[in-house]
Amino acid sequence: MAADHFGSLGGRTILYTGAAGGLGLETTVQMLRSGARVIAVDNNAAKVAALQDAAAGMPGLTVAMLDLSDLVGLRVGLERISAEVGGFDIVINNAAIYPSKAFEDYSIEEMQLVQRINVDAGIVCVQVALPHMKVAGRGRIINLSSVTISGGWSDLTPYVQSKMALVGLTRSWAREFGRHGITVNAVAPGAFPTDAEKIHPDLPAYEKRIYEAQALQRRGAPADIANILMFLASDAASFITGQTIHVDGGWVMH
């Protein structure tokens, strides 16, 4: 799909966490092609290098190697960048960690770390971006949730907790920020073939389960997520807010 299918993002500045990851890279490249400036927050050096290679020759990419678990440092870094670029028009909260083990084996500290990175860091991003959005009278906030919120998953309690929290934040923010022309939506990806899958000990059995659950008999591709994020970030989605959109091949149906 062409990067400008839903209209140009030219002139928009996007704050995108986890922008160099398995699903982030494709979206970042599409948004750069559409004329956006992307502040890519990611601290994985190898993935950042791959993103920079993929974006070679395209203007607009700024990499911010910030630690999302350090909320104070994150806020300071984002406020500095916001002042330099004139504010963020679009926030995409995508970064997450994905531990897997039996619930009783998690320490409180481990569970709190998941919430800090998967939820609290996104809250900081929105708090930093919000003043500019309010003055502009428009804005887009997109939270990446997960198919796991719909149940049927074991050993992922803190991850599922964090992804359901993002749905609640999406609805609350959509109601509160709507008067300022700001839309807030969530996207719940299904099971995509990324590095996150490597936590599953039996990958063939895991993939078999995916095909049994999905209506569509193919694996999702990064472009499937990039396309919906491009749409929600664009003016074409200006009357959609407070929604959680599942992109999962028909795994969950409403």
Describe the role of every protein-language-model region:
Residues 20-21:
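Conserved glycine-rich cofactor-binding loop
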